[in-house]
Amino acid sequence: MESQQLHQNPHSLHGSAYASVTSKEVPSNQDPLAVSASNLPEFDRDSTKVNSQQETTPGTSAVPENHHHVSPQPASVPPPQNGQYQQHGMMTPNKAMASNWAHYQQPSMMTCSHYQTSPAYYQPDPHYPLPQYIPPLSTSSPDPIDSQNQHSEVPQAETKVRNNVLPPHTLTSEENFSTWVKFYIRFLKNSNLGDIIPNDQGEIKSQMTYEEHAYIYNTFQAFAPFHLLPTWVKQILEINYADILTVLCKSVSKMQTNNQELKDWIALANLEYDGSTSADTFEITVSTIIQRLKENNINVSDRLACQLILKGLSGDFKYLRNQYRTKTNMKLSQLFAEIQLIYDENKIMNLNKPSQYKQHSEYKNVSRTSPNTTNTKVTTRNYHRTNSSKPRAAKAHNIATSSKFSRVNNDHINESTVSSQYLSDDNELSLGQQQKESKPTHTIDSNDELPDHLLIDSGASQTLVRSAHYLHHATPNSEINIVDAQKQDIPINAIGNLHFNFQNGTKTSIKALHTPNIAYDLLSLSELANQNITACFTRNTLERSDGTVLAPIVKHGDFYWLSKKYLIPSHISKLTINNVNKSKSVNKYPYPLIHRMLGHANFRSIQKSLKKNAVTYLKESDIEWSNASTYQCPDCLIGKSTKHRHVKGSRLKYQESYEPFQYLHTDIFGPVHHLPKSAPSYFISFTDEKTRFQWVYPLHDRREESILNVFTSILAFIKNQFNARVLVIQMDRGSEYTNKTLHKFFTNRGITACYTTTADSRAHGVAERLNRTLLNDCRTLLHCSGLPNHLWFSAVEFSTIIRNSLVSPKNDKSARQHAGLAGLDITTILPFGQPVIVNNHNPDSKIHPRGIPGYALHPSRNSYGYIIYLPSLKKTVDTTNYVILQDKQSKLDQFNYDTLTFDDDLNRLTAHNQSFIEQNETEQSYDQNTESDHDYQSEIEINSDPLVNDFSSQSINPLQLDKEPVQKVRAPKEVDADISEYNILPSTIRSRTPHIINKESTEMGGTVESDTTSPRHSSTFTARNQNRPGSTNEMIDLTSQDRVNYGLENIKTTRLGGTEEPYIQRNSDTNIKYRTTNSTPSIDDRSSNSESTTPIISIETKAVCDNTPSIDTDPPEYRSSDHATPNIMPDKSSKNVTADSILDDLPLPDLTHKSPTDTSDVSKDIPHIHSRQTNSSLGGMDDSNVLTTTKSKKRSLEDNETEIEVSRDTWNNKNMRSLEPPRSKKRINLIAAIKGVKSIKPVRTTLRYDEAITYNKDNKEKDRYVEAYHKEISQLLKMNTWDTNKYYDRNDIDPKKVINSMFIFNKKRDGTHKARFVARGDIQHPDTYDSDMQSNTVHHYALMTSLSIALDNDYYITQLDISSAYLYADIKEELYIRPPPHLGLNDKLLRLRKSLYGLKQSGANWYETIKSYLINCCDMQEVRGWSCVFKNSQVTICLFVDDMILFSKDLNANKKIITTLKKQYDTKIINLGESDNEIQYDILGLEIKYQRSKYMKLGMEKSLTEKLPKLNVPLNPKGKKLRAPGQPGHYIDQDELEIDEDEYKEKVHEMQKLIGLASYVGYKFRFDLLYYINTLAQHILFPSRQVLDMTYELIQFMWDTRDKQLIWHKNKPTKPDNKLVAISDASYGNQPYYKSQIGNIFLLNGKVIGGKSTKASLTCTSTTEAEIHAVSEAIPLLNNLSHLVQELNKKPIIKGLLTDSRSTISIIKSTNEEKFRNRFFGTKAMRLRDEVSGNNLYVYYIETKKNIADVMTKPLPIKTFKLLTNKWIH
């Protein structure tokens, strides 16, 4: 019955070409994403009808008909079973999958559905389902892979398939599988399934539908019995029985491998090489083929490989055939070397062929007669033959030889010959090295040339060869000029000999010339006749005069040829010859020097200026022009770099013609920022239209008065100097030109003001191009000279002088010549920035040096002198008394300039001017100098500070002209997380200068610190003081009684880490150690050269710098013992606020109360004399190599925030020298690395589709993910995420508007499984979103504050979740996404309507949407300054994306908000919070236990228990629990880390995971770990074994204390006020590069709500500065929190700040307006005073032992760590 139905309705079932058909359902094996049509939602069911071509019938599938695929016809009689295929995968008639939301990848179980095909597939047999036509296996058939391209693709509009498609034969044996699979692939391609078949690279053109997959699976099963499959195929199918595509892909790969061997042999046999590609590329290609054959066990011998290569050589490489023809032991490497040699030689010659010679096609008909010395015939040759003329051999030129000395009248030939023959070195020249390429034009077909032969030319007087391969004894050409019959010059590179070895052993040699500029190699019969050799053209031989035959000659075409096999090769790879013309160029000036002297002008301008005599005392012939046109000045490349060339003719074409100086162009440039006030910030330029003469004037501002003064000056100058009147001035429409003042000025003088018109960008081209040129020159000159930027206008001035003196490419004269002025006298010009010595006419004393180092800038406008910059005086002077400094190492030398030394050349050029200066200096005494030299008047006076204070100057020390020896210091390797990505690591090692305690200062509790200077200045002062009375090299004695008198007895000192040091006795008993150190020691204080004794002070306590205002030694609070914690900050409203009220209820450790007079307390208040040189660590940060302890660390000189100034008198009084080590640079590539440190990559917790569903072996979990998948799809369609009414073609949409998408899956903390369809925002184009929009979420401090207030006020806490929150927000931009895979619309796009998750703008759109709804519909208001915190009179809401936390005293108020939200959003109540018992929440990762009116506990035990074991960190390896996250005294070794790159990346990734999780936990509630997390985060990119161990130790401590919680208790109801307190602390200089660690803890009503630990952004120079920095970081956040608390709770608030630094409190308290030494920290201190007094903030002192913020700044011993944390986290 069933069979009859099949025959009656052949279209009812499809794809049944398999062994048997069963209708028995196996539910466990259905596809997890398959749903029945009856259960399909209405909107989904409609979506499947898109583009449907026909309606379905009860007998067909609900899937639309696909006219591009076919399948076998069903069969009434099932074929035999084909083996072990799983029969539950067979297609059943009643299992048509309608919805088919399946990914194109293979499901684990195959369910078949109907597949619409054409009845014309093939003629089915009623007794057997498969065609009877089975071609025998022995029948040869074309390779289906090779014939695939023969089948054209079926057009999209085609609705019928090919008729009579032959199915593949059935597999008969395992050995025939490779043959069978070819027919099977061809069968699929003929069935129009080629797009889903993988190619040899494993790629597919289109995604496979479920029906296509089922069809392939069933046909493969039908034609390939399982027991006949190869083993490797069975292994694939055992893993996934339906993975047929993998089998096909590997089969194609195996076929490609089998075909590769044949392809390699074909490629090797057909090798061709003519030099068009590089020899290296050819060698790599051949070697790759041979190596691939070798891997297939096919060995190709060198002899065979050489023969195959030689067979394919052509062009200049042909001669290798003859050379290797007789060799039996050919080596492949030798052949490659010969090919490389010829290629390099041809490359050099091609690069040096000149292009100025005429082509051969320009030659005329020439009749040439052989010389009388030979018996050769006369030949006539036509060089202009037509296309119909008979092909001829190579041209034979009439070549004549002439000597330079005999052709004195032929100047142009002599000059061209001379200028093209310069040597690249003084001693040798490479043949063809300096010639330019000029490819010869072949007027004769190249096929007429007889390869490897010389053309015998009877008309040539010289033998010419193109290759130097046969040239012996080569020397450069210096005397001979060669011309052809048309008297055109032929450049000759070299002269040598050709050696012949003829048949009978006769050897001879003739003279030959080498030139690449001929068509063929020419053998002169005249040269042969000189050797008694003649040519017999009747017998075609070369013969001696006695008739001996030497060699045969061959007639080819119309000419005779001699084989090159008789030539003896020279066998040299690079011919070098002596420079015979060296004496002619030895006195020439090198072009780089002239280029620098003339302001880095271009080659053409300089050459043209010299030809026009625009520059005097210098001729064009005096300059070495070799490589001048191709010379690349590195400074020009950097300084003149432009985007593109200026458009020619950009100036207005309708400009009228004016006389000189009647039409001016002007423009203003500026401002230039970050300059001293005395330096100009602008300049205004003028250009004359006629002469192009240029003027520049400096400007400090753009005020009307300044501009008017310049115009007055320029007009007066032109009128008096050039007797001309300015008629028109062209300018732009800037306000400086269009103001009324200037307009009136022009009107009164009858000058036309010509302004640019709207949108006319070309009208002002002259002035704009001038400014661009001047700025290019300015940048180049400053970069080349290395001078500071404040001299920028001097560079512009120099450039203007040079530009006025040079001829521009468009003019025949320079601007000076056009203006009637004399040319530039080059003897008056020095290179910009040339080091010079200027005479000092007024030294400090008669024995002081008379010379001051300086740098030449430009000639003076107002005198005959030169403007010199004196860095030591920070002035520019106008003087003629200077001497060029010889062999000065400066910035000029860093590019080497072809290793040229310009001192001698510079002296010769300036000899005339120098003699004038020397003559003046000889005749005049120092007292008779000019007035300008006496006064050193400066146009720009930068600063009036003394020389000794110029620490950042780039100048040369006046008294130390020799280059200082650089002492190399190994810099530590570590990562500074706080360094900006645009900065470089500090490059200076800090000083270790012992600091002297001043008597007067110590009586007030302060110290005087000796300031740090640079090594350069310190050595200068030492040199000065050594010869002065009373100077000494020894340090001052620090053991005197009057130096220390402030109770330094029995003081117990500790290291930064807390380990104890021995007691220090009274001053008389203090041990002062001395050691010998160098004045500039290295980092480990090794001594060298000069020595001095340095005291080592072994006293450590906290230091107070002398930069703070004086603090009373014995303030009134200290005199009374009744105030252990005195109120340091009195206030008018503080009558009821005391220290006890602030400290009350704080979780401080319980300590025995000690009076201030106790020794330990005294030591607490005594300023530290300071610590040791630090390295980097979690602990004391000490460096074991450092043996010196100093009182105070100084910040580096490159930290510009603090400028330490030391006068000369201070140094003379102290008789001290700087001990600062030399600067060293740490060369670590951190620019990209720092970004990684700042943004730690989180651990990926989501799964991809294949991970969650396709290959998920956990069936239960997979089912949950499938359910979540369908739920997400339904939600997307329900929310109208995209426009389903229209599909867009991909080719019609701008690609940047197309957004990629994907599905991600994850398991939430509550155990639910979630699927999310997200956009790939990480690759979203910037034009598709507004970068100014921000996605805001609630700040963690705001959440903690809200929770704390809720606990104190018995609030109800309700937790909500809004499903698919982003989908409620519309998008404004026009964006498109690719449809989900189930739709099968690969070339279509959908218009996006909603803010899909992952888009850049989705977060901001949702924030604006929900904010508007809460304000308008829920009567809420957002708290100012705290985004995502909303409140009204009853409810407070904290919003974090789609999570909402509601706080209210009345639960009904929360319910009312929920009801309002549900009207608009799908709102889910996670926890209503109505129970009076303990309620557990999971809020933003925090596990909270809350019982109203009692307590709140915050922890992450469940999360840490789940996540920590997944980090692959060994937990509890010894079975012991850690009691502290780190111990003091552990130091991170900063030696360079040598590690493999892959291992390095792996360890960095591991560090990112570990520190990322630790940071998440630390900033949530484990504030006690923040110091360790912050320190280790700085070393993420330095994953040494030590750093990893410390990180493991931190993770281990987190595991051991995972059950710890942040405990809060309800505030006492008797206290009506809210109390907000910040506790601050700083650890001075315990971070790398002397940075200080600062920390703050914030408490609300005694509950810790936040903490921060970070490295100070500025380098502090004392403990007080570090404490001030910490307090300044705490107060702004304290004020913001105060505003939030007052908004959320209307109770009065008391704000307090606690610190353990009395000096910081005194500074805040002080009203002294005395100027601080450090302006940066002085500014901070003054701001603190204003904030404290203006915000009613109470500042109190807290003992260090009670300061819980101490855990944020340093590692502590276990006992101390527990003592400070056990009150608030346990």
From Swiss-Prot:
Q: Does the keyword 4Fe-4S apply?
A: no
What EC number(s) does its UniProt record assign?
Answer: 3.4.23.-, 2.7.7.49, 2.7.7.7, 3.1.26.4
Q: Specify the protein name.
A: Transposon Ty2-F Gag-Pol polyprotein
For this protein, the record's InterPro entries field holds: DNA/RNA_pol_sf, Integrase_cat-core, PolX-like_BBD, Retrotran_Ty1/copia-like, RNaseH-like_sf, RNaseH_sf, RVT_2, TYA
Q: Any additional notes?
A: Retrotransposons are mobile genetic entities that are able to replicate via an RNA intermediate and a reverse transcription step. In contrast to retroviruses, retrotransposons are non-infectious, lack an envelope and remain intracellular. Ty2 retrotransposons belong to the copia elements (pseudoviridae).
Q: Where is the Integrase catalytic domain?
A: 656-831
Query: What function does the entry list?
Result: Capsid protein (CA) is the structural component of the virus-like particle (VLP), forming the shell that encapsulates the retrotransposons dimeric RNA genome. The particles are assembled from trimer-clustered units and there are holes in the capsid shells that allow for the diffusion of macromolecules. CA also has nucleocapsid-like chaperone activity, promoting primer tRNA(i)-Met annealing to the multipartite primer-binding site (PBS), dimerization of Ty2 RNA and initiation of reverse transcription.
What top-level branch of life does the organism fall under? Answer: Eukaryota
Motif Bipartite nuclear localization signal per record, residues:
1193-1227
Segment Disordered: which positions? 1-86, 359-453, 1004-1034, 1059-1135, 1146-1165, 1170-1205
> For binding Mg(2+) 3, which residues are annotated in this chain's numbering?
1625, 1667, 1700
What reaction(s) does this enzyme catalyze?
DNA(n) + a 2'-deoxyribonucleoside 5'-triphosphate = DNA(n+1) + diphosphate; Endonucleolytic cleavage to 5'-phosphomonoester
Protein localization = Cytoplasm; Nucleus
Q: How is it modified after translation?
A: Initially, virus-like particles (VLPs) are composed of the structural unprocessed proteins Gag and Gag-Pol, and also contain the host initiator methionine tRNA (tRNA(i)-Met) which serves as a primer for minus-strand DNA synthesis, and a dimer of genomic Ty RNA. Processing of the polyproteins occurs within the particle and proceeds by an ordered pathway, called maturation.
Task: Extract the ranges annotated as region (RNA-binding).
Answer: 295-397
> Mind listing the GO molecular function terms for this protein?
aspartic-type endopeptidase activity; ATP binding; DNA binding; DNA-directed DNA polymerase activity; RNA binding; RNA-directed DNA polymerase activity; RNA-DNA hybrid ribonuclease activity; zinc ion binding
One Pfam match: Pol_BBD
UniProt domain Reverse transcriptase Ty1/copia-type: residue ranges? 1353-1491
* PROSITE patterns found in the cross-reference section: INTEGRASE
Q: Give positions of region: Integrase-type zinc finger-like.
A: 579-636
